[in-house]
Every structure is written in C-alpha cells, then in structure tokens.
Amino acid sequence: MEQHHQYLAHPHSSEEIRTEDYIAGLAKGLALLEAFGIDRQRLNVTQVAERTGISRTAARRYLKTLKFLGYLDTDEHYFWLTHRVLRFSSSYLSSAHLPKVAQSFLNLLCAQTSLTFSIVVLDEHEVVPVARSYLPQQDNLRVSPYGMHLGNRLPAHATSTGKVLLSVLDREVQIEWIEKYGLKRLTPYTITDEHTFLETLDAVRQSDYCLSTEEHELGLIAIAVPVLNAQGLTIAALNCMSQTNRVQPQYLIDQVLPLLRNTANELRNLV
C-alpha cells in the first residue's frame, strides 16, 4: 500500500522535511538561541517569547534547560549566551571548505594593499563573514571596519556583499525578499526605495561587482565581487572594506577590483 507523507516547507528556503521527521522542540530551542544578537544581548522570558513566538511558560522551560546545559547564563531575570555556543562556530570554521581555502588568499590581498578583506555568505536577510584577512604585523596598527569579525551579521540590503549575493537571484525572489525583510534606512545613503534597489541589483549583476559607500555605517566604503564554484553557482562574495577617509572609490575600482576578480577566479577552481 502506497504511503502518502505530509511535508513541512522551510520558511526561508526551498527545503522540505517530512512532518514525522521534524522535531519541533529542537527547532524551538535553536530559534531561542538565535533570538540573542548584537541588538539584544540579554533577554528576559517575555522578550524571548515575543521574539520566538512561543508561550512564556515554554520560553522559561527552554531558557532553564539551556542554562542547565551551559549555553546560557542568568542573573535570574535576564539570560545571555555563554562561550559554550562558540563550539558550533569553531566546528564550522575548522571543517568548512571555503573558509580554509580562502584564508591564504585573503591574507595575500591584505599584504598587497594593507586593507581588510573577507569572504561573506547570505543568511536570510543578513550577510555573515566566514573568513577574514589576518596579518598580525598589520592588524596591530590597522583599525578594522566595524562588523568584519567572523560570524557577525550585517543587513544584506545595505552592504556590497549583500547586493552582490541578492543580484543573482531571480526577480520574483528579489521582490519577495524585499517584501519580507524590507529596506530599513541605516544611514542617509541607504537605498530604501524598492524600484531603486532593484535597479541597483540589475546594475550589480551586469557589472559583476558592487561598490557601496556609507550605506550601512557612515565613514565606511566597500567593494565586492561574487565567488562562484566550479558549476558556475554563486556561493559567496569576496569584499574589501575600508574607511572613506583612507581610500577613494576610484582607487577601489581601479586597483582593488582587479585583485578581487583574480582571486575569485582562483577560488572557483578550488571550491
């Protein structure tokens, strides 16, 4: 007799899972951990319930369990993440192929230009750096742009890497993305008009790079190119970020962009 299975669709991707294979409790626990962020490093039971959509009673039980397991700490009113959660990120960074392969290339770019470079991926409405240039002799003297430490999350619509990664999506998906996440104004230079933003994505897709000036934070400028795999699919973005009082846009286009493109081409044969 043929079995008919019910499936649950992922809210942010095309993934599906059979309902009998889905563990709702695990999903809620992970959602609770994700509720903590830069904007809200300490949360109480009510705030967690509001952020995750679960009841206060359930939120309290999840918080207590995660505290017992060592992932959270508390002062009996607010909860916050502990260093134990870094086990997940360290495991990813030590096992993921792209960050390991890209590291030496990023360091070389940094040595050539004394600027900061990173590999960034798209995660829903945010971009996440998974590899970053590092040269001890220069990092001691150089001020790193805000948000470029590994694992930090930045709004995709206001970053060069985000627009590169969004530009390769189908128009229907781009519109759905905008409708779902919006185009929040972060600085006077953030693009918040949907039509203008879509036109910008078209221009990025055609030119195969994106230059972004002070859209996420005043005083910062960045340029990014897509990183493709051997099958021609965009899997990440490679960018260079600096202060506006240190480099001019034309310098990034004339001098840094060719370096980014050459590096992206070399990575394509390795990922």
Curated annotation (Swiss-Prot):
Residues 98-271 form the IclR-ED domain. Keywords: Activator, Aromatic hydrocarbons catabolism, DNA-binding, Transcription, Transcription regulation. Induction: By p-hydroxybenzoate. The lineage of its organism: Bacteria, Pseudomonadati, Pseudomonadota, Gammaproteobacteria, Moraxellales. Residues 45-64 bind DNA. Residues 23-83 form the HTH iclR-type domain. This is p-hydroxybenzoate hydroxylase transcriptional activator. PANTHER family: HELIX-TURN-HELIX TRANSCRIPTIONAL REGULATOR, ICLR FAMILY, TRANSCRIPTIONAL REGULATOR. It comes from Acinetobacter baylyi (strain ATCC 33305 / BD413 / ADP1).
